[in-house]
Structures are given as C-alpha cells and as structure tokens.
Amino acid sequence: MKKPILAALALCYALGAAAQTPDTAAPEGYRFTDVKILPVTPVKDQSRSGTCWCYSTLSFLESEILRAGGPELDLSEMWIVRNIYFEKAVKYVRLHGSLNLAVGGQAHDVLHGIEAYGIVPEEVYPGLNYGYDKPNFDEIDAVIKAYADAVIKAGGKRSDSRLTTAWQAGLNGILDAYFGPMPGKFTYRGREYTPASFAASLPIDLGDYIEFTSFTHHPFYTEFAMEVPDNWNWDKVWNVPLDEFMQIIDNSLEKGYTISWGTDVSEKGFSRTKGLGIVPEADLEG
C-alpha cells in the first residue's frame, strides 16, 4: 500500500501557520505546543548551497528508517547532489540551455537518485573536496554552468552541430574534483557494501512514497508536472484540494509518519533567523 507521506505545496509558506502578520505579532511572540513528537535525526547544515531539497528529503528518509525499526543513519546529501547535478547538466546541454541549471531540486530527485545510484553514509562521501568543512557552492554552481554553456556554444559552431565524445567525461571530472571520486565499494560498521547494496539494506521501499500538491490551475485528483524551475526532470505530482492536502498531513503525523515538505523560503512570510513560516491573513505586497 502506498503511503501519502511526501508533500509539496508552493501555495503555503511553511508548516507553522498563525493568524497574525509579522507586523501585528503579539508582543510576547508566538507560542507553540508540541502536539505530536516523532523520531528524527539531528539537523544538518547545508550552509552556502541550494540543496535544501536533498537535506530535507534525506532527513525524512532517515526518520522513515527509524520508524521502520532501523538504525539511526546519516546519509550523504552530496552523493545525491553530485549525481543529480550530472543528470541535470546533461539535460541542460541536450535542450541547448533551455532548462534551469542550478543546484535546486525537489524531493523526487532524491528518490530517483537512490534508485539510480544507490546511497552511502555521510562518512563515506562527505562531498567536500574543495577546502571547506561545510558546503559552499558559490564556485561549483558557476563552474558547472560555465562548462555546460561552453559545450553548447562550441557544438553550435561545428558544421555538424555534434557534441564531442569527451564532454560528459569532462563534466564528471569537474564533479569529481569538487565532490570527490565516488567509491564503488566501502566498509561501514564492519560490513562491506556497494552503494546499491547499502540502499537495498535499508528497511524502506522507495516505491511507497507519493508526492501531493494543491494548485487550482490543474484538475484535482490528477497528476501533473509542477511548473516550477526546480522541477527540472518534469516529474509529476498528485493534485488535491487544499483541505484534503492538510488532511493527508494530519493523518500521516497522527499515524506516526513524518513528511517531507517542499516550500519557497523566499516568501515574505518566512524568517530563517527566527525559524518561523507564517501565512498572514492579508496578502503581502510584492
């Protein structure tokens, strides 16, 4: 039975909602009560990288592993990011640049990444091969974009418009330089694994998870490819009415399932420093 656990919604700002706007907040501030506490792993720092989609979804899967009776794990975000970046750059070149080539992504990218490339623990592949102890993608993003654009431009100048046979190897060379070479085998907690066998050892089935959203420009109870730049792979999500969307969340939490929530932290109702996401009564201008 498929479990409606993965949730994505761009109409709301965050899980924490309140009736007051930030400008009219009560002097004592917002008060929160723990209603349901579920097992989770420690929060990780994505630092200067647009990889929230990967950190949040792997955190969700780590919680799912705990729920299923598995051990507490710290899975490698950069393993997924590195592999998805390769796929995204290839598609960007194939479409002659008509695709969003940035580090952003969505929850289904993580599920696809594990299915296609397996997964490894953080200690096996931290993905920090460039002199920093936390992710910093200022240079990585610029280099990958410049390389892909150069490949497109050079191909367009050739009489046959062909790409060279070396460009994907060059892309992999850039990714390996920044993230590190990907291990084919590794030893973890006394056992030898491949990335695929380690993924297979986890007590979860990636086919069990479904993405939901709530938009009014597509029919409800149908799938559609959400039209946002980060959905670079054009994966589909199920569209349901907003009240049912919230019921899915409440029901999942009540039955002991955590969720993965995709949202837009650039909205004015979100404060990173205060750790609050607020849906105001009145529309915010701009």
What spans do the regions from the language model cover?
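Sec-dependent signal peptide recognition
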Residues: 2-8
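Generic cytosolic/nucleocytoplasmic N-terminal low-complexity/intrinsically disordered segments
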Residues: 1-2, 114
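Enrichment for repetitive, rod-forming helical segments
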Residues: 9-10, 69
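Hydrophobic h-region of N-terminal signal peptides that target proteins for export
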Residues: 10-18
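Catalytic-core signature of thiol
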Residues: 21-286
